[in-house]
């Protein structure tokens, strides 16, 4: 280990550690962080050098956070990043400090949001909240309104997760949707991501994403929001159905082709009988 430490610079160690952290499966950040911490054996170097990786992970994963005094959780995303570890909660019109390691919010302050797009953002937010409530048992969403390159833009982010460490699996759904307010029609651009990790007696990960494009009729705020949500619903239903069908096909064909159902002898092994033989033999020898 000493030779390894001598050969690898602190900069390279931090780069490797950051790589592990940013690729941590959903719901397993703490486990990966603790393992990396043991390997690096230098807390100051890890906290200072890999702090950017903590932030990247939380923004990429759309980590939801509860702010004390406010009912709804908000997502940590690049679209709400105000710098200096402060993030925007457009629904509650506040900014807050976020600890990327502890995943805790603090110091909420009033913040100007929407950039003159208040009615557009609120219409889309209201419609999206209703959709998420209907389709996700543990879902959260945040809607931003921004002017990007002179274009008035609505950005909608959705996150839903199920963490079941006692059953050896964790999973997260993320989707991001954008459109510019350019009557009479606008292009909707979306990306959908699924990441699931199953690790009982093995290590299997599903990492999937799909890019979506569609056209949207831009009229008044309420009607446009309704059409926007309809596009989201159709695309996400189609994606989920395709994933389910693909895995059923793999289960019926691909996975079965990977191994024999019976060994070469064409006889199933009775493991319980073998175990009883072994125990009996050991008792005789005793």
Swiss-Prot record:
Sequence positions bearing Phosphoserine: 9
Molecular function GO terms recorded: actin filament binding
GO BP annotations listed: actin cytoskeleton organization; barbed-end actin filament capping; cell junction assembly
Positions of post-translational N6-acetyllysine modification: 19, 97
Subcellular location: Cytoplasm, Cytoskeleton
Entry's Gene Ontology cellular component terms: cortical cytoskeleton; F-actin capping protein complex; WASH complex
Pfam family, one: F-actin_cap_A
Assembly, per entry: Component of the F-actin capping complex, composed of a heterodimer of an alpha and a beta subunit. Subunit of dynactin, a multiprotein complex part of a tripartite complex with dynein and a adapter, such as BICDL1, BICD2 or HOOK3. The dynactin complex is built around ACTR1A/ACTB filament and consists of an actin-related filament composed of a shoulder domain, a pointed end and a barbed end. Its length is defined by its flexible shoulder domain. The soulder is composed of 2 DCTN1 subunits, 4 DCTN2 and 2 DCTN3.
Function description: F-actin-capping proteins bind in a Ca(2+)-independent manner to the fast growing ends of actin filaments (barbed end) thereby blocking the exchange of subunits at these ends. Unlike other capping proteins (such as gelsolin and severin), these proteins do not sever actin filaments. May play a role in the formation of epithelial cell junctions. Forms, with CAPZB, the barbed end of the fast growing ends of actin filaments in the dynactin complex and stabilizes dynactin structure.
Entries under PANTHER family matching the protein: F-ACTIN-CAPPING PROTEIN SUBUNIT ALPHA, F-ACTIN-CAPPING PROTEIN SUBUNIT ALPHA-1
Similarity comment text for this entry: Belongs to the F-actin-capping protein alpha subunit family.
Name by which UniProt lists this protein: F-actin-capping protein subunit alpha-1
Gene: CAPZA1
